[in-house]
Amino acid sequence: MKRGIRHFPRLWRASRLARRWYYARAGAYPDWRSLIEPEAELWQSARAGAQGGPRVLMATAIGSYAHAATLESALSAALTFRGAEVHALLCDGSMTACAECDASLYPDLSRFAEHGPSQDLCRNCFSPAESVYRQLGITVHKFSEWLGPDDRAEARRIANTTPANEIQAYTLDGLVIGEHAYAGTLRFFATGALDDEPMAEPILRRYFESALRVAFATRRLLKSIQFSSAVFTHGIYVPWGIVGEVARQEGVHVSTWNVAYRKRRFIFSHNDTYHHTLMSEPREHWEDVELS
């Protein structure tokens, strides 16, 4: 059935959006409240004991990544029991494009070039993940809280005036911005090159503007609140690649993760992404491990 629907782009889009709407309301996210209630006193004691401990930022960012909100909220609970003061970072509609967007959702690409995800994907993104973290009593930071009007204007100015052929190599104060914006655009089109993609330039500029916004907001957050570590998925694209760039520059330890190739396992990489650490990890760390 899925293959059949894909032959009808507008029907495919409608089914995807309907599925997102349903999952945001029906069981795709953990119900921490029901887990905490039987041991409420224990959890409150753990939370109180964690205040003032090492601060860890769960930069989930994209709330509709239910699997990310699930794992990162579980890590939040585990770290709280171990004395860490955990905060979360979510986008509340501030990004102009992100890793949740892809061309198959937009049969009319000009619509995305003009509006981005603001008229559809953003509607069911922030609230479910915020609810997950609020159930745990974790402080939730929104991109909009750390992004001022001047930041938005500057991001728009840079994105509109930088020559298209210079975007990929663009850096800001030593931060690799353009590379992640370009990678995000490639991901949007599910391609290895943008040369033959319709609307490639305006969509690249939209990802570029979004990357700049994420950089401005994340930098202000990390300069205002001292975090010892930041945890998030992938470590590339927009927003996670940009969050990683800023965190490393600000001296915050970065831990990225992705779903592993073995069932019910995850790959964690420190201060880099699994794309690199899978190639550079010393073989002696695993070659003699007895696998079940």
Where do the language-model regions lie?
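Conserved N-terminal ligand/cofactor-binding loop architecture of enzyme catalytic domains
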Residues: M1-R55, A59, A78, R82-L212, ...
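A short, glycine/small-residue-rich beta-strand->loop->alpha-helix junction that serves as a flexible
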Residues: A61-L71, F232
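Short, well-ordered alpha-helical microsegments
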Residues: H67-A68, E72-S73, V238-G241
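Short, solvent-exposed amphipathic alpha-helical segments in soluble enzyme
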Residues: S73-S76, A247
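Conserved nucleotide-sugar donor-interacting segment of glycosyltransferase catalytic cores
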Residues: V214-S269
